[in-house]
Amino acid sequence: MKSSGPYERETIGERLRPAKISILIRPRILPAIFAFLAFCSSSLAENWEATLSKDPVGNFPELRPLRGSYRFGWSGLTAATGDVHFTKPAENKFQLDGTGRTIGFVRALFKLDVSYQAIASAETLRPIETQQTESYRSKKITTHLTFTNNGVTRARTEGKGAAEAKTRQFNFPNLFDLFSAMLYLRSQPLKDRSVYRVVAYPATNAYLATVTVIGREKISVHAGSYGAIKLDLQLKRIGKHRQLEPHRKFRRATIWVSDDAERLLLRIEAQVFVGTVFAELQSVSFENPK
């Protein structure tokens, strides 16, 4: 009979010993791995907050009171119209009032009427309060936002008739709403390739908005032809623990703003879950001539 070699004489127990050691070590390694990943996640969360724009309010001339009209749609089809009224009701306040509604055959399928009012500080361009009402065929949603230096309180009612408001608090210093974020960005130099990052709370959630100045170009809209500043907008949702999450419905948007003393919002093209949607300036009139 042929004698067995040294490796062939190895017992089953000896062969299994490395596996036993691995099994014993793994429970100790896994918690360490999870702790490391949690640390990395926490560090990333802190890192994005460190990238927020810290530039003070710019010295670009403030916007004159105006009235403007827009149309909204997709693939060249107009689905809704809207009107805005920008005013300065007091020396220390800016105010934006807006209304919008679906039209045509789109309204037969999806009835929606919207009213919006936002008030911001004329000195700091920080939001004070926002009121938004959405009236659908079968329900009505009202959202009221009250801002402080430390965050925002949201009161929201939903239903056909009077309903109890559900409140929610989101604490984050130096928040913007949609209106004040536009005012702040408008005040900046907006040099080519510059990047601005702000946290905005438009209605129900907070988002990290990253705005990049792509460059300058000519654009024609219904209201006229303009030299324009072209901007890229990306959004990330901010979760309960301040972690960044992808926006479920919004991918990115391209925005054109007039490259003049007014810096009017001319056109937006947004990539969303249904395709490309747009908003375009139809007409504008100033209440105070130059």
Label the model's feature ranges.
Residues 10, 16-33:
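Bacterial N-terminal signal peptides that target proteins for export
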Residues 33, 124-130, 134-137, 172-181:
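An N-terminal domain-start capping segment
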Residues 46-149, 189-290:
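Acidic, serine/threonine-rich low-complexity disordered tracts
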